[in-house]
Design a protein with these regions (language model features):
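Short alpha-helical Gxxx[C/S/T] motif in the catalytic ATP-binding
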Residues: 125, 130, 134
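Short beta-strand/loop element within the Bergerat-fold HATPase_c
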Residues: 78-88
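Conserved glycine-rich
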Residues: 142-143
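Conserved catalytic submotifs in the C-terminal HATPase_c
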Residues: 43-53
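Short conserved segment of the HATPase_c
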Residues: 101-115
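Short beta-to-alpha transition helix within the HATPase_c
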Residues: 22-38
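Conserved micro-motifs of the catalytic ATP-binding
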Residues: 15-19, 53-56
């Protein structure tokens, strides 16, 4: 219950308490996220490298990625993070190996408090705010989060961010 109240308040507060933008070592942030998850016995793999810093709010980005990784581990047992560096944007793909979701539900799951009927259980927990928070953080940085069912199975969350805030 405490977690649900905390997440609801965070969502309602939005990004009004934004931390200042700074240069962020993406690989260090991802490795920290990986270590945090491994300490909890959760499998998170990182594939790819970023050679330049990203400009943004590191704690907000970590929260965004944590929400995506939490979903991947919760519904697909493990998370694979693929890092892609392009001249105009940084792309982080978080893939799970679970059942995916119906295409008709892909945009709906970004709505606050929306949960797929099959995901409502005591084991999975959650408030239905994780993806809404992740998308809000991405959009506050000029980017976005999209979902797609991966052709080899599972769900892939694609976080695309410009290198610098506008």
């Amino acid at each position: 219950m405490e977690s649900m109240v905390r997440e609801t308040l965070e969502f309602m507060r939005g990004l009004s308490h934004r931390e200042p933008a700074q240069l962020v070592d993406i690989m260090a942030l991802l490795e920290s996220l990986q270590a945090d998850n491994e300490a909890m016995g959760r499998a998170v793999a990182i594939d790819g490298r970023v050679t330049r810093p990203w400009t943004g709010a590191p704690q907000l980005l970590k929260r965004c990625l944590s929400n995506l990784v939490d979903n991947a581990v919760l519904y697909g047992q493990r998370a694979q993070i693929r890092v892609e560096e392009a001249p105009d944007q940084l792309t982080l793909r978080v893939r799970d190996h679970g059942p995916g979701i119906p295409d008709s539900e892909i945009e709906k799951v970004f709505a606050p408090f929306y949960r797929l009927e099959g995901s409502r259980s005591r084991e999975t927990g959650g408030t239905g705010l994780g993806l809404a928070i992740a998308r809000n953080i991405a959009q506050a940085h000029g980017g976005d989060v999209h979902l797609r069912n991966h052709e080899e199975g599972g769900l892939e969350a694609i976080l695309a961010l410009p290198w610098k805030l506008a």
